[in-house]
């Protein structure tokens, strides 16, 4: 196996070809290539290989494949007691694919303490909107009092969901989006969400680090499973597993 390179590969707009992922840089971790394009063909080719674009506005397109990789196995989602209490109040409603562009705009504009500016440029908005129209990119919307207060978006290929970004305007709204998404994906037979880079927030929700090699082996299995691109609708009662169960009182028995 070749040693990791110290410079990223430079890509032309054609052909749509990425270098082998094991040639990605180790510093910065996972930077593989520069250039290419953000057409649906480029993006879908990238996600199939576990590669994603991430770059600042006005910079060239940067393609990444970090090692290790942050992922959330859906059965490992952590729903803490405080979040269960919030769910039980039933103050939120959740939809899928109703306001994709709005969710992306909210993700782009929300203030984050760990970054200056946004990487979700107009170029990215346009590219992922095209993927949404073709049934590959999806959004989760969280509503409270008929206002959009949280959500997330990402790309689905086969039975892998590649999470891109999330936002929250009120406490727990982005967590609600993830919980509802996991309930629906589980019902459809998905078992993994790619969360890309490790963060304390994602780790608290159950995300874990796995090797690039293991991640790519999962992709080879799961992205080829039959799940046609289409608009999504929420088909499950995502709150049901968390609602308080009625207490059944045992009847006293008396001996004759």
From Swiss-Prot:
Task: Show the InterPro entries listed in the entry.
Answer: Acyl_CoA_acyltransferase, Leu/Phe-tRNA_Trfase, Leu/Phe-tRNA_Trfase_C, Leu/Phe-tRNA_Trfase_N
Q: What is its main location?
A: cytoplasm
Question: Known EC number(s)?
Answer: 2.3.2.6
Its Gene Ontology cellular component terms are: cytoplasm
The family database entries (Gene3D superfamilies) matched by this protein are listed as: Leucyl/phenylalanyl-tRNA-protein transferase, C-terminal domain (3.40.630.70), Leucyl/phenylalanyl-tRNA-protein transferase, N-terminal domain (3.30.70.3550)
Highest taxon, organism lineage: Bacteria
Instruction: Tell me what reaction this enzyme catalyses.
Output: N-terminal L-lysyl-[protein] + L-leucyl-tRNA(Leu) = N-terminal L-leucyl-L-lysyl-[protein] + tRNA(Leu) + H(+); N-terminal L-arginyl-[protein] + L-leucyl-tRNA(Leu) = N-terminal L-leucyl-L-arginyl-[protein] + tRNA(Leu) + H(+); L-phenylalanyl-tRNA(Phe) + an N-terminal L-alpha-aminoacyl-[protein] = an N-terminal L-phenylalanyl-L-alpha-aminoacyl-[protein] + tRNA(Phe)
Judged by the first EC level, this protein's enzyme class is: transferase
Q: Where in the cell is it found?
A: Cytoplasm
Q: Please give one Gene Ontology molecular function term for this protein.
A: leucyl-tRNA--protein transferase activity
GO BP annotation list: protein catabolic process
Task: Decide whether keyword Aminoacyl-tRNA synthetase is in the record.
Answer: no
Keywords attached to this Swiss-Prot or TrEMBL record, sorted alphabetically, are: Acyltransferase, Cytoplasm, Transferase
Q: Pfam families per the record?
A: Leu_Phe_trans
Q: Which family does it belong to?
A: Belongs to the L/F-transferase family.
What job does the chain carry out?
Functions in the N-end rule pathway of protein degradation where it conjugates Leu, Phe and, less efficiently, Met from aminoacyl-tRNAs to the N-termini of proteins containing an N-terminal arginine or lysine.
Entry-linked NCBIfam families: aat
What's the protein called, per UniProt? Leucyl/phenylalanyl-tRNA--protein transferase
| Name of the encoding gene | aat
């Amino acid at each position: 196996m070749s040693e990791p390179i110290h410079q990223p590969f430079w890509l032309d707009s054609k052909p749509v070809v990425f270098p082998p992922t094991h040639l990605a840089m180790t510093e910065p971790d996972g930077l593989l290539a520069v250039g290419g394009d953000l057409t649906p063909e480029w993006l879908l080719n990238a996600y199939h290989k576990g590669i994603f674009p991430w770059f600042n506005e006005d910079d060239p397109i940067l393609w990444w494949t970090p090692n290790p990789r942050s992922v959330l196995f859906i059965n490992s989602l952590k729903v803490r007691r405080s979040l269960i209490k919030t769910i039980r109040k039933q103050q939120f409603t959740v939809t899928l694919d109703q306001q994709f562009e709005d969710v992306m705009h909210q993700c782009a504009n929300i203030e984050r303490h760990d970054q200056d500016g946004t990487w979700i440029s107009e170029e990215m908005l346009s590219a992922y909107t095209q993927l949404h129209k073709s049934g590959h990119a999806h959004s989760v919307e969280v509503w409270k009092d008929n206002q959009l207060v949280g959500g997330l978006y990402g790309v689905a290929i086969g039975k892998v969901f590649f999470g891109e970004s999330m936002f929250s305007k009120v406490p727990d709204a982005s967590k609600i989006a993830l919980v509802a998404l996991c309930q629906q994906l589980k019902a459809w037979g998905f078992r993994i969400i790619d969360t890309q880079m490790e963060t304390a927030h994602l780790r608290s929700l159950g995300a874990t680090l796995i090797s690039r090699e293991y991640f790519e082996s999962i992709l080879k299995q799961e992205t080829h499973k039959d799940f046609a691109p289409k608009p999504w609708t929420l088909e499950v009662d995502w709150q049901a597993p968390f609602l308080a169960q009625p207490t059944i009182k045992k009847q006293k028995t008396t001996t004759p």
